Amino acid sequence: SGEQTIYENIAVQNTQVNAGDLILVNDANAYVDNNASEIVSIYDKKTEHYHVSGTETSLRETAVDALNRMLEDFYVAKNHSDIIVISGYRTKDQQQKLYDEDLAQTGESTSTRVALPGHSEHESGYSLDVSLYEDGVQSDYDGTGDYSWIDENCDHYGYILRYAADKAEITGIQAEPWHYRYVGEPHATYMKENNLCLEEYLTQLKDYTSDNRLQIVNWDGEIYEVYYVAADMAADSTYVLVPPDQDYTISGNNSDGFIITVDTGRIQSFEENSTAETTASEGQTVPEETQAETAAAPEENSEEAVG
């Protein structure tokens, strides 16, 4: 039956609550991380089958890499190369400018169309807006027709349609078919399959612990385990249980805790259910050969996960 997966405690700085692929940025949760070291120009890294509005339009490097794969596959599937990224990463000052311009246009005291400065997902570098651009003419992107391929498949690349019409009451943002958010795999697939927006998903994850992990079968059959650890706000850092012999990442939720995502190295067999909860007794046994395949130096993992 193999050996038990051993968990060990590592200390994670509480400032990391505000960083990672799964952070929630909305009216209630300001973006405070302000680490722009991973922000890169999309233009410098993009593939040939989409456009970008300017050389300064930027995203986090992981989000650009995923975007490149997605839009290359979209081109292969549908033979369209007219998507243009019109907005990515914004500084707080740029967001303030957009906000002020909207108020000037509407004459209102608050905006329903532009997020408050400090509260826009764009400031995190994980979000982008797209339009269509052909023969010098830009037109609105609505995600219909051939372009529905993107909503149907974006989870394969770690992206979600962030502001769906049926979630407006929860997100506080009206439908934006052009706004995509990178959350990473396997989270995008789980959210899509269970029709959850990011707010709902992060709330649900609080039900899972290192003893009672959420098992997610990714779109490609790879099995992940996900759980939540509340931040110890009385201290500067929080002890988080992680499996040192497996690949894992740690993301803050931007409010009060950490989400640990473990790549078990296992692939779903056909008779297994698509999603299941894993308890400590059933889930902590991993075949020895699987452990060997996914083993990595704990020090490397620990640094990578929280850096």
Segment roles from a protein language model:
Residues 1-88, 92-307:
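Extracytoplasmic cell-surface/polysaccharide-interacting catalytic and binding patches
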